[in-house]
């Protein structure tokens, strides 16, 4: 049974473009190669501008750890982590199950 990963990132306004590019070119392709499915990715237009919300579908809780361990061992991770350190203010990670009424 799948588990969903809801990630909210508060990103510096000046770093939003760089963050989005890093996700598009590095993180998303790598994590999809690990079997994660990006169910949605959003940039807030109201509330705190620049917040980014990602919704991923994973096989199970262990899938999260396996993919992150593989990413941290990859040559691209150091540059990606440096970009995150410069652009992300905070990150909230939540695991969730699909509600009974979801289609």
Q: What kind of feature is each model-predicted range?
A:
Residues 4, 34-53, 78-103:
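Glycine-rich beta-strand-turn "strand-cap" elements at beta-sheet edges
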Residues 3-8, 19, 31, 52-58:
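Short, structured motif recognition centered on aromatic/hydrophobic residues
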Residues 10-12:
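Solvent-exposed strand-to-loop "edge" motifs in beta-rich extracellular domains
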Residues 23, 68, 81:
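Short, flexible helix/strand-to-coil boundary loops that buttress conserved ligand/catalytic motifs
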Residues 15-41, 72:
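Short amphipathic alpha-helical segments
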Residues 1, 14, 58-75, 100-103:
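Glyoxalase I/VOC metalloenzyme domain signal
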């Amino acid at each position: 049974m799948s588990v969903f990963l809801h990630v909210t990132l508060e990103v510096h306004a000046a770093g939003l473009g760089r963050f989005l590019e890093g996700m598009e070119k590095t993180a998303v392709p790598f994590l999809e190669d690990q079997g994660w499915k990006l169910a949605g990715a959003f940039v807030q237009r109201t509330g705190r501008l620049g917040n980014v919300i990602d919704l991923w579908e994973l096989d199970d809780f262990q899938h999260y750890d396996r993919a992150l361990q593989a990413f941290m061992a990859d040559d691209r991770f150091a540059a990606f982590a440096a970009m995150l350190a410069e652009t992300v203010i905070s990150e909230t990670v939540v695991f969730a199950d699909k509600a009974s009424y979801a289609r």
